[in-house]
C-alpha cells in the first residue's frame, strides 16, 4: 500500500514539474530582479561590513543569504566578487605577517611565548571576509549558502585563474569542514517510502548513470537493490552524497548485468554479494571534502 502511494506520488511530482528539471526563469522577470536587487545587495553588504552591533550584523547577514537564495546571477556575482576581494590580505596584514615571519621563537622558548606568537599569527591572517563569513554561515540557510558560494568561487577561480576567488574558496572550505561535523551527518536509506520530492531530486542529481524514467528509478530501488544518502540539517534535504547498491549472486562481470536492459534479479535470501556500483557527490561546493568516502565507510 505504501509503495503504491509512493509511486503514484512520485509520478505526480514528475508530471507537474517536468521530468527532471526546473522551469527556466522568465527573462523579463530575471531582468527586473537583477536591476532591483543589485543595488540592494551592495547596500546590505556595505552596511554589514560597517556595522559592529551584533544583532544588526545578524539581521543583515540573514538578508544577504536571502538575496543569494533568490538566484539572480548578477547579484550573486557581485556578492562573490565583494567577498573574494575581502578574502585577500591587505597591506597591514602583509606587514604583520612579514614581522611575524622574522620573529620565530628560539628553540626552547617558553610555551607562553610560542602560544602568544601563534595567537598573533592567527589574528594577522584573519581577513575582512572572515568575520562576514562567520555571520553568513550562522544565518538561517547559511550552510547551504556557504556550499553554493564555494561552488561559485571554485568555478571562477578555475575559469579566470582568479587569486581572490581561490582565497575565498579556502576560507569557505575551512568553515564547511567545521560545520559539516560527522556528528551532524545523517545516513538514510532511500526507498519507495522516501518522499517523492527527495527521490526526484536524487534522480535529477544522478549524472554518472542518468535515470530517464520512473521505471528506471523503480528498478534501482527494487528488493535486490538499495540506495543510501548522506544529509546535513543545514542543507534542508539536499543530499551530500549517495550510493547505489545491488545484491547479487557472485560478482557481475559487467555493469550491464545490474542496470542494463536485460539485468537480472536475485532473491535477497540467495544473494551473497553487495556491489557498490555507483557513488555520486553532487555538491560542487563540497569538492575535496571526502563525503563519498564517508558514505562507503558508513
Residue ranges and their predicted role:
Residues 1-298:
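Extended, composition-driven regions rather than compact fold-specific motifs
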Amino acid at each position: 500500500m505504501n509503495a503504491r502511494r509512493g509511486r503514484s506520488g512520485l509520478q505526480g511530482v514528475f508530471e507537474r514539474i517536468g521530468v527532471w528539471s526546473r522551469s527556466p526563469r522568465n527573462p523579463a522577470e530575471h531582468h527586473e530582479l537583477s536591476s532591483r536587487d543589485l543595488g540592494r545587495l551592495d547596500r546590505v553588504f556595505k552596511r554589514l561590513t560597517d556595522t559592529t552591533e551584533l544583532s544588526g550584523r545578524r539581521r543583515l547577514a540573514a538578508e544577504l543569504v536571502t538575496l543569494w537564495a533568490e538566484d539572480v546571477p548578477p547579484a550573486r556575482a557581485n556578492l562573490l566578487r565583494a567577498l573574494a576581494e575581502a578574502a585577500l590580505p591587505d597591506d597591514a596584514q602583509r606587514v604583520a605577517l612579514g614581522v611575524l615571519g622574522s620573529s620565530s621563537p628560539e628553540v626552547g622558548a617558553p610555551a607562553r611565548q610560542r602560544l602568544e606568537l601563534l595567537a598573533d599569527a592567527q589574528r594577522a591572517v584573519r581577513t575582512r571576509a572572515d568575520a562576514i563569513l562567520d555571520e553568513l554561515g550562522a544565518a538561517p540557510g547559511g550552510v547551504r549558502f556557504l556550499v553554493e558560494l564555494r561552488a561559485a568561487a571554485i568555478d571562477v577561480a578555475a575559469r579566470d585563474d582568479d587569486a581572490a576567488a581561490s582565497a575565498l574558496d579556502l576560507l569557505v572550505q575551512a568553515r564547511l569542514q567545521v560545520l559539516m561535523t560527522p556528528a551532524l551527518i545523517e545516513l538514510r536509506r532511500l526507498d519507495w517510502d522516501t518522499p517523492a520530492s527527495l527521490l526526484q531530486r536524487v534522480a535529477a542529481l544522478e549524472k554518472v548513470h542518468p535515470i530517464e524514467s520512473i521505471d528506471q528509478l523503480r528498478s534501482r530501488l527494487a528488493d535486490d537493490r538499495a540506495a543510501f544518502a548522506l544529509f546535513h540539517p543545514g542543507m534542508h534535504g539536499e543530499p551530500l552524497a549517495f550510493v547505489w547498491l545491488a545484491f547479487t549472486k557472485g560478482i557481475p562481470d559487467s555493469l550491464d548485468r545490474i542496470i542494463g536492459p536485460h539485468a537480472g534479479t536475485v532473491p535477497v535470501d540467495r544473494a551473497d554479494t553487495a556491489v557498490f556500483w555507483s557513488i555520486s557527490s553532487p555538491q560542487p561546493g563540497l569538492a575535496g571534502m571526502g563525503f563519498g568516502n564517508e558514505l562507503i565507510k558508513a
